Structures are given as C-alpha cells and as structure tokens.
C-alpha cells in the first residue's frame, strides 16, 4: 500500500496526444518526425498534459538517434539537434510551473519502427548497445533536463549496457522502466527480479518500474518489484485498448477503466503513475483528479 506517500502524476502517450491533435507521425521517425516538422505541436501536446494535471512530462526524444536518422535519410547532426530540441521544447512548455522534465531514452529496437523494442535480443554486443545509448544521452544531458526517462527496456542485457553507458554521466538522475510480457517477466524473458537487480546497479537510478505494458499485468509486477527493491516504483502502462488505424483512435478504453487501474497501481505501491500508448491528456486529467481526490 502507498498510504501517506505523495503520488506524482506522469504524462501520457505523446504520440497518442499528437495523433488526437491531428498530427501525422507515421513513418520510421515516429514522434521524432514532429520534432523536425512541427515542434509547435510537440509543445502544445506537452502543455495539454500539464494543464490536465501531469507533474512530469517526457520529451519527444524516444526514437531519436543518429543511426535512426541516417537510415531515414537525414544527417547525423540532425539527430543531435533533435535531442537538444526535445528538451528545449519541453522546458518551454513547463515554463512557470514546477513540472519535471524527463528526457526520454528509448530502447535500441525503437529505431526499427517494427516492434523490436518489445522483444530485445538485437544481436548486438554490450559495447555496441552502450555506445548507441551513450551518444544520445550525451546530447540529452547537455540540454539540462531534470532527469532521464530510460523507458520501454525489453531486455535485461540492454539494461546492463545502459549501466555501462551511464557511468560517464556522474550519476545524472534517472528512472528506468521495463516493458513486460506478463506479471513476472520482461519482454525478452528474464524475470522482473533480474531486471530490478540490474536497475539498482545503474548510476543515478532513482526509481524503477514498468511502462508500455498491458495494464492487466501491472498489479502483479508492482508486487514483485516492491518485494525486490526499496526504490520507489513508477508505472505508466498502455491504456489496454486496440488501435484502430482507420479511425486513428484507441478503441475499448474508457476513462473509468484508466482511473480504476491507476487506483489499483497506487494501492499496490506505485507512487509515480501515468499512461503510455492510448492515454491522451484527457485520460491523464482523469487520473490526476482521481488520485488527488483519494
């Protein structure tokens, strides 16, 4: 139980919010496309989450990397600029508020735009993965976010590589969240306890948890995480619906469903709570209102 603990509301799915605003983010760069083509929309999306009650916003850098930009036909320095710009935009949106700006560090598989971020097992060495993440983190940290959001990590081996990469950043504050396939395992198959053990070894990690995961698994995952660590727990799972590509909306999810789940996650011990794919600003508003009223 988290009785007496302060609940912090994390924002929702940036891509979901952008799509709800009519933005076209299809293609290999996903939300990174909007960083280049429509930065004002990114800022508006951040502002929408803040207005809805989010205490923490996550930058649009999830899918930004030199490798990904080069493969999409852009220059490497375009990626470097986009990383810094993602933090700058979030800072502008949060100006005049106490909102925490967390710079997104997505998994290696996100550059493929084919779902590999939910599988892991990339066939790369620890050094290759560490180098990939280090060059991104360098530009994000230089832009001075409040912390890093290392998110949607599907494989303990990638977390181990991130531990190596983060040694160069003197314990810069961060959280790490894993993508899970059931109540006990991350997507690549290792146990959540193995993932937590690695998380605790990473310099600067202040909280650990779950994101981009079906909500049905989250209560059990929180229970196992809290049994394995004293680190605070953060969860921002998917909304749990089905994406309808024709309508451009998530189907089968109500705000009542989202609120019910958020209350359960709080009661199981999570203290930072938000949403991921399928949760737009209106859903975060419902979570914020419900958790602050309880």
Show the residue positions of the predicted features.
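Domain-level signal for soluble alpha/beta catalytic cores
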Residues: 1-294
């Amino acid at each position: 139980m988290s009785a007496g603990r302060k609940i912090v509301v994390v924002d929702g799915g940036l891509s979901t919010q952008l799509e709800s605003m009519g933005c076209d983010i299809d293609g290999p760069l996903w939300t990174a496309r909007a960083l280049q083509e429509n930065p004002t929309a990114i800022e508006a999306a951040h502002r929408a989450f803040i207005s809805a009650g989010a205490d923490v916003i996550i930058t649009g850098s999830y899918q930004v990397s030199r490798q990904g930009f080069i493969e999409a036909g852009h220059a490497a320095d375009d990626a470097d600029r986009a990383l810094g710009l993602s933090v700058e935009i979030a800072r502008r949106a949060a100006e005049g508020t106490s909102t925490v700006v967390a710079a997104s560090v997505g998994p290696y598989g996100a550059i493929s735009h084919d779902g590999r971020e939910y599988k892991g097992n990339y066939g790369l060495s620890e050094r290759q993965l560490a180098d990939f993440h280090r060059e991104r983190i360098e530009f994000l940290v230089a832009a001075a976010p409040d912390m890093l959001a290392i998110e949607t990590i599907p494989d303990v081996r990638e977390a181990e590589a991130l531990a190596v990469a983060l040694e160069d950043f003197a314990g810069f504050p961060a959280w790490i969240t894993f993508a899970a396939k059931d109540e006990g395992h991350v997507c690549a198959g290792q146990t959540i306890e193995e993932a937590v053990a690695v998380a605790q070894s990473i310099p600067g990690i202040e909280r650990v948890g779950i994101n981009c995961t079906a909500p049905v698994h989250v209560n059990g995952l929180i229970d196992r995480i809290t049994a394995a660590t004293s680190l605070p727990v953060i969860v921002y799972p998917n909304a749990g619906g089905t994406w309808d590509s024709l309508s451009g909306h998530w189907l089968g999810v109500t705000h009542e469903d989202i609120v019910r789940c958020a209350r359960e996650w709080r009661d199981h011990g999570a203290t930072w709570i938000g949403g991921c794919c399928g949760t737009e600003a209106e859903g975060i508003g419902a979570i914020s209102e419900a958790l602050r009223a309880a």
